[in-house]
Amino acid sequence: FLLVGSIFAALSILFGAFGAHFLKEKLSSDQLVVFEIATRYMMYHSFGLLIFGLLGYILTEEIVSAPGMMMIVGVVVFSGSLYLVSLGGFKKFGMITPIGGVVLITSWLIFAYNIYKQS
């Protein structure tokens, strides 16, 4: 999770800069907002993955394994679909965005449950 979290964080910074400096002139304001949401949620969950990666060394791996894998899938589906929608021509991918959001929420809830179960 440390590796994927680090990669997601780097991509978030790269995409944020790309959006601010290159896409600002190319996308509508609505498309830019969607692109920024995708970038923001990717960054938030990169921190989550980094936390899960570090906690994997402190706690048992089973506490972070399922939530971490779900978080990776959630970021790819949620942010990935928003990137495609914002860049135009891929509006149908917007239908899967809520699935990615539900997977992200569920990853945090499973993590909370695993922590609760351990204590």
Question: What residues fall within each predicted segment?
Answer:
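Polytopic transmembrane helical bundles with strong interfacial aromatic enrichment
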Residues: 1-119
